[in-house]
């Protein structure tokens, strides 16, 4: 059978294409690799172990049969070319007796498969967008919580200084010391109003 008459299947390579800005699935994969995240879902782990076991078993059976054929002095089995050509000619003439999963021909099966893959990709994009949005919301809440905590710390320090100034005014009528009313031990370690208000705390 002429090789030129065999239909060729063109597979598009999307790895070399530029990533679209709204490709949420690609962004999610990049973020997962950056954070080195791995799924620990039991169903996925079981499926992965089952696939690896099947691959290992298939390789072992193939290697074992090859070794037996070599020991027996036999040539490796090969599919007869005539059988392949007959099957291709039968498929080309439309004389296939078995059905293609309920489809009339291979074109309908490919159209249905392409449609299913497109719907799955859309669902994956939606799920990836939701996950990225959820991560952004979590980071935003963390920042807001940190700012709220720093604001409370700053307010507590400010109220403490105001109370100290009021007590010093009530208990002592002497002149204000150069250390902004703070005691000498606090001045020695660098605790002043300037440090508390602008150095040790932040309003984000």
From Swiss-Prot:
Write out the entry's keywords from A to Z.
Answer: Coiled coil
- Report which superkingdom the organism of origin falls in: Eukaryota
Q: Which cysteines are joined by disulfide bonds?
A: none
Entries under Pfam families matching the protein: FAM167
Q: Where is this region: Disordered?
A: 58-80
Provide the coiled-coil residue spans.
113-146
PANTHER family found in the cross-reference section = PROTEIN FAM167A (PTHR32289:SF3)
Q: Which family does it belong to?
A: Belongs to the FAM167 (SEC) family.
Name listed for the protein in its UniProt record: Protein FAM167A
Natural source organism: Danio rerio (Zebrafish)
Q: Report which gene this protein is encoded by.
A: fam167a
């Amino acid at each position: 059978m002429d090789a030129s008459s065999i239909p060729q299947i063109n597979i598009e390579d999307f790895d070399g294409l530029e990533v679209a800005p709204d490709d949420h699935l690609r962004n999610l994969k990049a973020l997962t690799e950056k954070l080195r995240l791995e799924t620990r879902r039991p169903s996925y782990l079981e499926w992965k172990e089952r696939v690896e076991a099947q691959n290992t078993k298939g390789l072992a059976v193939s290697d074992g049969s090859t070794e037996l054929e070599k020991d027996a002095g036999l040539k490796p089995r090969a599919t007869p070319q005539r059988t392949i050509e007959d099957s291709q000619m039968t498929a080309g003439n439309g004389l296939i007796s078995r059905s293609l999963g309920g489809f009339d021909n291979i074109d309908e099966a490919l159209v249905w498969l392409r449609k299913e893959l497109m719907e799955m990709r859309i669902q994956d994009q939606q799920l990836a967008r939701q996950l990225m949005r959820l991560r952004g919301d979590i980071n935003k809440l963390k920042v807001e919580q940190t700012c709220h905590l720093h604001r409370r710390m700053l307010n507590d320090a400010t109220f403490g200084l105001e109370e100290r100034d009021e007590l010093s005014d009530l208990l002592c009528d002497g002149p204000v010391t150069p250390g902004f009313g703070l005691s000498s031990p606090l001045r020695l370690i660098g605790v002043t109003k300037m440090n508390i208000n602008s150095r040790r705390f932040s309003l984000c």
